[in-house]
Amino acid sequence: MQQDGLSSVNQLGGLFVNGRPLPLDTRQQIVQLAIRGMRPCDISRSLKVSNGCVSKILGRYYRTGVLEPKCIGGSKPRLATPAVVARIAQLKDEYPALFAWEIQHQLCTEGLCTQDKAPSVSSINRVLRALQEDQSLHWTQLRSPAVLAPVLPSPHSNCGAPRGPHPGTSHRNRTIFSPGQAEALEKEFQRGQYPDSVARGKLAAATSLPEDTVRVWFSNRRAKWRRQEKLKWEAQLPGASQDLTVPKNSPGIISAQQSPGSVPSAALPVLEPLSPSFCQLCCGTAPGRCSSDTSSQAYLQPYWDCQSLLPVASSSYVEFAWPCLTTHPVHHLIGGPGQVPSTHCSNWP
């Protein structure tokens, strides 16, 4: 059989035309030899056709029963015709759980397509994606005028009516705990401020609350406890609340660049005399153990202890820092001893 085109020789010595399918008589011989029981490798050597070509022809014949080659030359004809596309959309609308290969089988069963002219699975999936995109675009166009249109106030609208949250923003409702839930959470907090995951799970099961809600409650409760402790500490030390925020150029702070004799004594603030109760609070000692050379003139200089992050008070050479007591002589900074009355408070073991 003479064919137009440039012929070539394969590895077995057979002639073929590049880009052209095998002749129909060769295909019939391949099928007849396979029906007689000859193996594909023996058919390939006998007819001098590549083993891959024999396998593809036999596989297509067993699968579809078609022996003729597919269309040659030009592009592949469109198998997804408008009628087929409409039926695919109808099947997917009626049975959303259908797979593409099930739709393909249904098209062949109904007779809309033959077995060799049915659209492939990838083509059906492509059609379904296009239909879904068109549908989503349609709904977007329907919603867009209502969203983009400006909201004009009505002359009969009530201006004093409360406004709800914006439709586009998410609003989280505040969790309201029952008395039993609040009591159980508070008992667990008194037992430990940082419960582990097991304790949180048990508490969530006991209070019928989500574990995330329990975790957030403990976080908020710890923050509330810190605020309460800070207020309690400031109430015990009335002068400490003013010393928490120290300005940059505070008259009570002596910078490192200043010489010892250049700081005037008026720059130091004058506070209240040292009371026995304050000495007992800071030192942890009895009032009788706090000795003073000048009992009527005991003055303190407030400053900030960076290690304990608590404002403490110092006398002439004493620093009231908790839990340890360290001494820093202040008379060296103000030009020598004797200018500030010495007040000594020792830490008893």
Curated annotation (Swiss-Prot):
DNA-binding region, residue intervals: 5-131, 170-229
UniProt-annotated stretches for the region PAI subdomain: 8-64
Keyword Lipoprotein carried by entry: no
Stretches for region Transcription repression: 278-349
Molecular function terms, GO-annotated: DNA binding; DNA-binding transcription factor activity; DNA-binding transcription repressor activity, RNA polymerase II-specific; RNA polymerase II cis-regulatory region sequence-specific DNA binding
The keyword Transcription is annotated on this UniProt entry: yes
Keywords: Developmental protein, Differentiation, DNA-binding, Homeobox, Nucleus, Paired box, Repressor, Transcription, Transcription regulation
Tissue and organ expression note: Expressed in early pancreas. Later restricted to beta cells. Undetectable in adult islets.
Chain positions covered by the region annotation RED subdomain: 83-131
A Pfam cross-reference name: Homeodomain
SMART domains: HOX (SM00389), PAX (SM00351)
Annotated localization: Nucleus
Role description: Plays an important role in the differentiation and development of pancreatic islet beta cells. Transcriptional repressor that competes with PAX6 in binding to a common element in the glucagon, insulin and somatostatin promoters.
Protein name, entry field: Paired box protein Pax-4
Source lineage: Eukaryota, Metazoa, Chordata, Craniata, Vertebrata
Gene (UniProt): Pax4
